[in-house]
């Protein structure tokens, strides 16, 4: 997407300047245009949002700029301290707590020399930690003065990144003034109590104060233009940029970090959104097409057919299904009465002649005869079984012949009864079948006629609706491809000719065709992530298992984007040394510790601590015996200079003469204050 040529009207500032720019001079309006406004909409998620686009939340985070500002203020304050101020604060602390070397030695005179030195080191470490914490609180208050407006303020770092991501340039409006940041910083330095209590803080505030005030003025005097209320013009002949606020009429300057390309009639920006815009628009169009298909596309109607195999159709297949359901297949061969009765019914259904009844029933009775007539369960001696009684005069018969005759008689009676019943039933069925066949033939003829009429009516109605739709769309000859598509949506699929007696419709449904765009979304997500990570030099942090834990600015990103923000956008007088990528993820106290170790104050504290421990160790040494008059006469010289030198060397540096009062830490000066030993 590129900025199209637009007519730049002649504009005047509120001060009554001459014509700002004219079309004949080669000025072209490059923002706002439909293309540049689309960039901002894309960045806000109006064209969709993907997982890879979430990296931009880290890119526009102000964490790196905040850490750079904190490091600059910490460096300015700590490097503004002097050895004299630090020594004075330490001397006051020693006198206030009575920690002079002589007093420490007298207090711990029974301790070993190493223990006394350890006490001295501990005493100084306590004061050093207290001083460091006090200075951190003071520096934290100074940093708070530079955060007016928060993330949405006029000089916010996220707004700076938004401009670079969309256009690769930043329009800046400047007006020198003392605003909220300057007023807050001045009031803080005047009203804080620490400068009146510690010489170190007072000296640091006095020396670093002017530079900090200049930095605050730079924050107050700079305002980055809002994306939707600024006009940007470009003159290719002169290579100049012009920025103007259409509401206030204020003119500004344009910081071009990534120079665009002028193609003769348009400007192609060098920015991440410019490079991703074609892919984003194409993917968005595909999603819109899928949504339209979801709403209006009704083709195609699909019919699912199911057909049995030849071995599973007919009576044999039904018998096999029944056998399997009742457990009467070849594998099980169960002998339940229900299965035998069902098999009898199925065999009777499969009979082709009336004479088959006798064979079917006899087969059933042979299979179930032993169960229907159980010989032990029937008493043949009872009345009703012929001459089976055991009365006198009766001749005993063969025991096996009687049950066999009974079974034959039972089978004959059953077959005769079934034959008589079925003959009458079959005769009635034959008559009914003939009557239904005649009726069915007439109904089939009528149904075919009605079906033909219905098809003709549907075809005519569909053609009329299609013609009406074509006329409403501007004529049928204008867009033949779309007309064919609309007709295809109403195609009727006839599957009646593909079906026979053994075929049935198992399911039918209407399927909406929706184009798949999942792969396009995944590709766009990877493009977003790749472009943002590579363009802004984002650093990934991983654990030992290779899993990503966080992402942050690298040292290259700080040099490429954070440094120009302070140097060219804010025009900060003292931005200090650039932080590294590892410093970005540090907390405020951790950053303070890292900066503290690199400043001169750390060196001063190390030196003062070494001198204090040395004085304590020197005071703990045993004192030499007092010299006698003979010693003085033996070592005296004719001029008396040797006596003076011997007397001077008998005293240790930093120790008072024997019997003299302890004046504090070091040698007494003329004004009564002790000299600090260096």
Swiss-Prot record:
GO terms for cellular component: host cell nucleus; virion component. GO terms for biological process: chromosome organization. Keywords: Disulfide bond, Host nucleus, Viral genome packaging, Viral release from host cell, Virion. Forms a portal in the viral capsid through which viral DNA is translocated during DNA packaging. Assembles as a dodecamer at a single fivefold axe of the T=16 icosahedric capsid. Binds to the molecular motor that translocates the viral DNA, termed terminase. InterPro entries: Herpes_Portal. Residues 376-405, 459-480, 622-678 are annotated as: Disordered. It comes from Human herpesvirus 2 (strain HG52) (HHV-2). The keyword Disulfide bond applies. Residues 642-652 have a biased composition (Basic residues). Residues 459-470, 667-678 have a biased composition (Basic and acidic residues). Transmembrane segments: none annotated. Residues 422-443 are annotated as: Putative leucine zipper motif. Its main location: virion. Homododecamerizes. Interacts with terminase subunits TRM1 and TRM3. This is Portal protein. The gene is UL6. It is found in: Virion; Host nucleus. Belongs to the herpesviridae portal protein family.
